Structure formats: structure tokens, C-alpha cells
Regions:
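Short pre-catalytic strand/loop immediately N-terminal to key active-site residues, enriched for Gly-Thr
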Residues: 10, 165, 215-220, 271-276
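Small-residue helix-packing motif on alpha-helices
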Residues: 63, 73, 97, 113, ...
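Internal alpha-helical scaffold of NAD(P)-dependent oxidoreductase catalytic cores
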Residues: 84, 142-163, 177-217, 230-267, ...
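Rossmann-like NAD(P)(H) cofactor-binding subdomain of soluble oxidoreductases
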Residues: 64, 70, 75, 80, ...
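NAD(P)+-binding Rossmann beta1-loop-alpha1 motif at the extreme N-terminus of oxidoreductases
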Residues: 1-100, 157, 177-178, 241-242
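Glycine/serine-rich anion-binding loops at beta->alpha junctions
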Residues: 168-174, 219-229
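NAD(P)-dependent Rossmann-like dehydrogenase/reductase catalytic/cofactor-binding core
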Residues: 2-9, 252-328
């Protein structure tokens, strides 16, 4: 399925365009520039061609970024300056952004979702549109309850509602290395909608589709995961510094070692087999691994993901002090 001919591009609005919203917009707009360059290059009769990526029927061509503060607007203007012709930045005017949009990306803080969506004008402006939420801990049903007072599973195209989709990208979106989890929808999205949502998030990294019941664990693993990995990276770099390596080189070496390891795993190597391959009898690797096992690093890291999963489930409920005590 290719992009339709003519001036039929979609308008994408980001409500609450912070760090993640900027990263997603940047990835999408950079990709659109690449597509235009590829089209221009393919017009040349010389050289060889490679199979083109299958595109959604319609792609975004106009963009709105909605923020509350002037400082946020200035930041977007600087970071997305090369895309200025197709981007409109709105301060304190969410309603216009939603009215202009075909697709709305909801990127505000989870506790603000009620204030942003809970009025009749926004509800009317969203009618028949696609609303993609990247809010941690906020299920589709909660958003539908805010908008409509219930979470009916009727086909929105039959009752004038917007279609709500939940996705969980992570901070690596900034370097287009996100791991995004998209919740499957009931009833399923139409083929054009599904293609568009998947395309949007593959602009910033990898994508998997999982049931809604997996989203809190996905938030913990993928959303919180970069912080967990950064702590491990920092710890091994600290150990190297303690043994005499310069800080900058130790951090670079640790980061590249982690990157290389993930490359092997993404290439199909099982972590346990990889670990065993490096652990020669009587060597330094097995000695270090046993220290990690004695320190229950495996169980502690697993518990961190479990704890973050439980906390993630509370984020959209307005619960205060969710990290004040351990959930049982």
C-alpha cells in the first residue's frame, strides 16, 4: 500500500509536546524528508534500486505541537527548526490543534489527561479521529471514560467517537532507538489505521504489538528500562575507574560493550549462551559473574521491573505517593 496521490496528507497534532513528542515528531519528519529524497533519486535512470518500504495509504504532511508554556514553544522551535515550514506551534490552544488534526498524539503528563480531554469542545473536535496515547499507566478505557463516560467496545465509526490507541515508546526515541509497545485494540483498528500507527513508531525504533494487559509490564521494561540499564552501565564504569581507568574512557568502553552485547542478542544469540561462551574455565568472567550472583543482582533487577510494573499501574489513577511503600 503506497501513499495516495494528490494533496491528501494527514495532519498530526501532538498535545503536550515535551521531550517524547519532540522526538516522535523529529523521527516522523526526518523520515518524510528521506522519502521525498528517495522519490527524487528514483526519478534518475542511472544506478540500481532497492525495494521501497511499504507506506501507509496516507502520511502526515502538516504538524501541530501544542504546549502550555512559552519556554516549551521556544524549545520546539529550536529543536525542530529545519522542519519549520510544515510545523505550527500552539501555546495554550489545544482546541485548535485538535480541530485541525486527523491524528492526535497525546503526550501530556498522566495526571493531566483529565484536564486536557475533559471538556465538550475537545470531545467534539476529536469526533471520528484517531487518538494515540503515549501516557504511562493510563489505559484506553480510562481515556474513553474521560471523554464519553464509559468504555464501550462499539465500533467508533458507528457512534462518532474517536478511536483511542495506546503505545509506550521510550526515551531512546531521541536517537531513533526506541522500543515501542503498541497495545492491540478491540475491535481491531482498520488496516489503514494500524499501518499508520505502526509506521509512526517505527520512525523512532522498533515496534511490537501486545495485548493491553501487558502494557504496565511493558512500561516498566521499556519505559523505565533505559534508567535501569544506565545504572548498570554506570556501575561497571565505576568499577573500572576504581581499578585505574580514566572516567571518560571507562564510560565509553562500558557503553560500547553494552551496545555490542545487545547487538548480539538482537541478532539471535540467547543471553545465557552468550554468557557461557565468554565464561572460560578459571577465567576472570566466571569469577565476576559469581560475585553478581552472590549479590542477587539477577533477582534485584527482576524485582525492579516487577515493582515498576505495579507503580506504573497506579500512575493514571491519581494515587499519591505510589513509591512511598512497596506494593505487595
Amino acid at each position: 500500500m503506497g501513499q495516495s496521490n494528490g494533496d491528501s496528507g494527514l495532519t498530526l497534532t501532538v498535545l503536550g509536546c515535551g521531550t517524547m513528542g519532540i522526538a516522535i515528531l523529529s523521527g516522523i519528519m526526518d523520515s518524510l524528508s528521506d522519502i521525498r529524497s528517495s522519490v527524487s533519486a528514483s526519478a534518475s535512470p542511472s544506478g540500481t534500486s532497492t525495494p521501497a518500504e511499504e507506506l501507509p495509504q496516507r502520511l502526515p504532511s502538516r504538524f501541530f505541537a501544542c504546549v502550555r508554556r512559552h519556554e516549551s514553544a521556544k524549545r520546539i522551535k529550536v529543536e525542530l527548526s529545519k522542519h519549520a515550514p510544515s510545523l505550527t506551534i500552539l501555546e495554550g490552544d489545544n482546541l485548535r490543534g485538535v480541530r485541525e488534526a486527523d491524528v492526535v498524539l497525546l503526550g501530556c503528563k498522566p495526571q493531566m489527561v483529565g484536564d486536557i480531554l475533559g471538556n465538550d469542545d475537545i470531545r467534539e473536535a476529536l469526533k471520528g479521529k484517531l487518538l494515540v496515547s503515549i501516557l504511562a499507566g493510563v489505559p484506553v478505557e480510562q481515556i474513553e471514560n474521560i471523554l464519553y463516560g464509559d468504555s464501550s467496545f462499539e465500533d467508533p465509526s458507528q457512534n462518532g467517537r474517536c478511536r483511542v490507541v495506546r503505545a509506550m515508546p521510550n526515551t531512546a526515541s531521541k536517537v531513533r532507538e526506541s522500543m515501542t509497545v503498541i497495545a492491540t485494540s478491540t475491535p481491531p483498528l482498520s488496516a489503514p489505521q494500524s499501518s499508520l500507527v505502526t509506521w509512526m513508531f517505527t520512525r523512532i525504533g522498533r515496534v511490537v504489538h501486545l495485548p493491553p494487559s501487558a502494557m504496565d509490564a511493558s512500561t516498566a521494561l521499556c519505559g523505565s528500562g533505559p534508567a535501569f540499564m544506565a545504572l548498570i552501565l554506570e556501575a561497571v564504569a565505576d568499577g573500572a575507574v576504581a581499578m585505574g581507568l580514566p572516567r571518560a574512557e571507562a564510560q565509553l568502553m562500558a557503553a560500547q560493550t553494552m551496545r555490542g552485547t545487545t547487538g548480539l542478542v538482537l541478532g539471535g544469540e540467547h543471553p545465557a549462551i552468550l554468557r557461557d561462551k565468554v565464561s572460560t574455565p578459571g577465567g576472570c568472567t566466571i569469577g565476576g559473574l559469581l560475585v553478581l550472583e552472590e549479590g542477587t543482582v539477577r533477582g534485584t533487577m527482576a524485582r525492579a521491573v516487577r515493582e515498576a510494573t505495579v507503580v506504573a499501574s497506579q500512575l493514571g489513577k491519581g494515587v499519591q505517593g505510589v513509591n512511598g511503600t512497596r506494593f505487595r
